[in-house]
Amino acid sequence: MTNGLNVREMALEILLEVEKNGAYPNVLLKQTLDKYLYMEKQERAFLTRLVEGTVERKLTLEYYVNKVSKTPVGKMKPVIRCIMRMAVYQIFFMDSVPDSAACNEAVKLAQKKGFHTLKGFVNGVLRNLSRQKESIVLPDEEKEPVKALSVQYSVPEWLVEKISKDYGVEAAKNMFASLYENVGSITIRVNNSKISTEECTELLKKEGVQVEKAVYVENALEISGYDSLAFLESFQKGYFQVQDVSSMLVGLAAAPTAGAQIIDICAAPGGKSIHVADLLNGTGHVEARDLTDYKVGLIEENISRCGFSNITAKRMDACVLDEQSRESADVVIADLPCSGLGVLKKKSDIKYRMSQSQIEELVELQRTILKNAVNYVKTGGTLVYSTCTVAKEENDQQVDWILEHLPLKLVSLKDCISEELLKNTDREGCLQLLPGREKTDGFFLAKFQKI
């Protein structure tokens, strides 16, 4: 163990920030890992799994605690609540951790945080759970289908009902189950204007990275087994970009021709913009826009690392019409702010933050941005609309609104997206991906031509 570091205490600090201040666990986790780069690989993996697992399984963990505790989780002090969830996650979902260690370390943390009088309570609840873990029964799926799926997959009941209504119970179950599959690998897109996919694969293997061919996109790879991307020469040289396969489809749908002028209106962290810059192979120009200096900084970091000269980043509010950009773009990419219900595997806290009323607000925001974005497209040019959600209000129903209110028509995706992906979407020009059905994030895109 690295001297002076208590990994469980580090996890607790992250989870407390999430609990008390609504912080984003993925952001805090990255900041912590970046700060303590000297941590051993095993410790980094333990911290990551403990934080991510405790967040993604929160409702399940609370169900277990409430089965044996006289004090409901909701009435516990935030520190104790977080300690309990962490310990229960280790007991139920981390086979490598002895139950006794999970209990003892939780008691030590409670004491260290000043809750000496509650150490007996913490110890009693956790040891009871350890003894009873094989006999605790989850809600019956036939009698209480919504509650059963909610507890089993740690998804709020309103969201279980919504997804089940929109796509059917079986698709909902597959979607929720997929949140816990194939954890630990990430998908990358090789920048083929810099290196071939085969050369990049060999280089990654020489760097000790496990590499698999990803599905649906030729230059997509799945990688795992590395310590930190920042240490990889192939990453430093900009040979690849971290990007889910679903997100890569936006660049393929945009299908830019040599010399094209492209505007990506909500671009951070820049994956789609860099993809189309790569497809342009040094020609044309991509303007990658976003709202804040921080987001523009993220785009600029990736541009600098990848070394492309045909792309620039610019701070701009997509809700405000940019008169100077009227009829200036051959392609506009509108990957807009959305509910994020397709990326719960990567950002599991979204399912606890989101609500139906927020979805409705996002629909209005998307329409405001789209009314501006259509002005930037040349007549006959392309607008690609995309979201990382499965909410129909933001996807299919938003397309209905676009066709009724904007000078756009849907155009076929058959020349740029594989038949295998298109077979599950009935509407020409649209693509809806579902986790558990396709091997991707949940994602939607629609390709339009300006008329």
Regions found by a protein language model. Give the residues of each.
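S-adenosylmethionine
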Residues: 1-451
